[in-house]
C-alpha cells in the first residue's frame, strides 16, 4: 500500500469519526511490510476519554496485537497533524515514520507549536512526510465545525 492509499484510509476513518459526532480525525498504522496493523478515528466522546485520539487508539491497538510496545518500522498515517500528546506517544512507541495530510496551526505539534520532534529532549525522531489532499482533509474538519456552529 502506498502513501496515498494509506492516507485515503485515514481520511475515511476521519469521516466515520465525524459521523459519530467526534472531531473528524483518522489514523492508520502500517507495518514495515505494508500491512494494516490498526485503523481508527477519534473516540473521545464515545469513550469519555480525552486521550482517545485516533493516533493513540491505533498505537495502543497495534502494540497490543503485536504484544510489543515498540512499533519500529511502522508508519502512522493521520488525516491531521498530530498534537503534542500524540507526538509523545509516537516517540515512545518508536514509530519510524509519520505521514499526515492537513496541517494544524492551532493544535499541531510537528510543524507547528512545540515542534515536538525538534526538541533536544526528544529521544526518537521519526521521518515526517506529507501525503493526500491537504485541502480536502482540512475541509472535512471545517465542514464538521461549521455544522456544529449552525
Predicted segments with their positions:
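Short, charged low-complexity linear segments at domain edges
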Residues: 56-69
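Immediate flanking context of iron-sulfur cluster ligation sites
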Residues: 68-80
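Short beta->alpha transition motifs characteristic of CBS
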Residues: 37-44
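Short beta-strand scaffold segments in enzyme catalytic cores
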Residues: 25-34
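Zinc-dependent deaminase
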Residues: 1-20, 36, 82-150
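A short, polar/charged loop-to-alpha-helix boundary motif
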Residues: 46-56
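Small-residue (primarily alanine) positions within well-ordered alpha-helices
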Residues: 10, 14-17, 27, 38, ...
Amino acid at each position: 500500500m502506498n502513501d496515498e492509499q494509506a492516507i485515503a484510509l485515514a481520511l475515511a476513518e476521519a469521516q466515520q469519526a465525524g459521523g459519530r459526532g467526534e472531531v473528524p480525525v483518522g489514523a492508520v498504522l502500517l507495518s514495515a511490510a505494508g500491512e494494516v496493523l490498526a485503523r481508527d478515528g477519534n473516540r473521545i466522546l464515545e469513550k469519555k476519554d480525552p486521550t482517545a485520539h485516533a493516533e493513540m487508539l491505533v498505537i495502543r491497538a497495534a502494540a497490543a496485537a503485536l504484544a510489543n510496545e515498540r512499533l519500529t518500522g511502522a508508519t502512522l498515517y493521520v488525516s491531521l497533524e498530530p498534537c503534542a500528546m500524540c507526538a509523545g506517544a509516537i516517540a515512545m512507541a518508536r514509530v519510524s515514520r509519520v505521514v499526515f495530510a492537513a496541517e494544524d496551526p492551532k493544535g499541531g505539534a510537528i510543524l507547528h507549536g512545540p515542534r515536538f520532534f525538534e526538541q533536544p529532549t526528544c529521544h526518537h525522531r521519526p521521518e515526517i512526510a506529507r501525503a493526500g489532499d491537504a485541502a480536502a482533509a482540512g475541509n472535512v474538519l471545517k465542514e464538521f465545525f461549521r455544522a456544529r456552529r449552525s
